[in-house]
Amino acid sequence: MVDLRALFSETGDIPWIVGLSGGKDSTAVTMNLIETLESLPPHIRRRKTCYVTCVNTLVEAPPVIDHVHRFIDELRKYIRDRELPVVVVELTPDVEQTFWVNLIGRGYPTPVREFRWCTDRMKIRPQTRFIKENTEIFGDPPVVHFLLGTRFDGSHARKKTMQNHTRIGSDIHSHGTMPSAGVIRPIEDWSTDDVWNYILKEEWADGGTNPFYEVNQDLAILYKDAASGECPVIHDPTKQTCAGSRFGCWTC
């Protein structure tokens, strides 16, 4: 079990970034971060700023992007009311890297297993650009820790990728494309049931009501009868997204 409270202190002022796709796993990590911050004394939690980034590819399925916007609205309201050191950042691909510019303008074929050009251009680059444009925060080269919702209980391919980047004896693992960055996997040992039980729980860390309970009920409905899994926050261009589930782009 990853101890986020301990890691928060151990990692000093190194910024944390949670990549929010809107799916169940990244939602769980986002909530886990918020609960962790609330459990820390104010003078400890203020040692670093955490970022929640969400990349809108501009071809997300309408029900999905509507849900993401609702969750982000609730998240922003909560962190503002609780004065938590969290900044929510919404990102989009550069115009010249959008789906239709590449498909129609450049004549690219629709993404396929052997040529999934969309992953790097539409998911990875916007976040990389955000980090590079803010060197005063992240440094150059950037020193940052990504909190990802990858789980060993996921697909075989994802499990293999996690194993390849695992640092034995540490909860901070290597990043696929950014050598100076690290990856923290707060829910790596959770089962799918663990994830759902967590995001749909009614209780919150302070004994109150889960502020995301209602919006997560809608998330559960989105998943109903859908393919398991969602497009994760990709940090390795060789990894495939999961077109076919409700959390893939509608174009695939």
Enumerate the predicted regions with their spans.
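Nucleotide-activated chemistry modules centered on ATP-dependent adenylation/adenylyltransferase
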Residues: 1-18, 24-252
